[in-house]
């Protein structure tokens, strides 16, 4: 009989986050308990609590992992980026983000739904927005002032989140994917209007 492989810290956190994701998608964040999450892992209660003290900490890591996933996707398309066509490039990337059907999207949808009733989630949302803005600036370096002010950034964030919610809650993802070009054109139009 072979020795049981000991999981690394990253593997254990990933196992916990995968369990949490399943429960959050099924029950919603407000009804998710640490006990639910622990039950979906191969770890002991103490083992899970060693890495995460509460569901909020796990959700925060899930949201950060989702941002890292999205940044990798954008970086993989940087060869399409051309100076002078920044708005078009960003519109394409933002529309892809809005309609992407990935592991993190249903969790993000639950996060958006729950943040209205949970002030701690709203604080996490504001923190994630700051990190997103910094990442956009980092991706394009100083070639392009992505968002001239916070009001513009807030508007574009709200616009994207409305499409993300509709994609999931209203099952509109397929319709949006079919009309992707129109969504990109709308995003370019909105961006150019608000950047004046």
Regions picked out by a protein language model, each given a short descriptive name:
Residues 1-11, 196:
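N-terminal intrinsically disordered/low-complexity leader segments
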Residues 53-57, 61, 82, 99, ...:
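Residues in soluble alpha-helical coiled-coils and helical-bundle/repeat scaffolds
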Residues 15, 19-57, 61:
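Helix-turn-helix
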């Amino acid at each position: 009989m072979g020795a049981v492989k000991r999981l690394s810290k990253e593997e254990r956190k990933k196992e916990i986050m995968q369990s949490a994701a399943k429960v959050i998608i099924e029950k919603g964040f407000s009804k998710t308990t640490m006990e639910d999450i622990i039950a979906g892992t191969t770890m002991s209660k103490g083992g899970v609590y060693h890495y995460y003290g509460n569901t909020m900490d796990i959700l925060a890591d899930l949201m950060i992992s989702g941002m890292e996933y999205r940044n990798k996707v954008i970086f993989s398309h940087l060869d399409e980026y051309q100076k002078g066509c920044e708005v078009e490039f960003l519109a394409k990337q933002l529309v892809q983000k809005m309609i992407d059907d990935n592991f993190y999207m249903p969790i993000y949808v639950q996060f958006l739904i729950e943040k209205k009733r949970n002030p701690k989630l709203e604080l996490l949302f504001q923190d994630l927005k700051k990190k997103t803005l910094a990442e956009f600036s980092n991706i394009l370096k100083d070639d392009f002032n992505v968002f001239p002010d916070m009001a513009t950034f807030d508007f574009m964030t709200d616009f994207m989140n409305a499409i993300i919610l509709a994609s999931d809650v209203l099952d509109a993802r397929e319709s949006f994917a079919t009309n992707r070009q129109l969504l990109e054109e709308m995003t370019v139009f909105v961006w150019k209007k608000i950047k004046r």
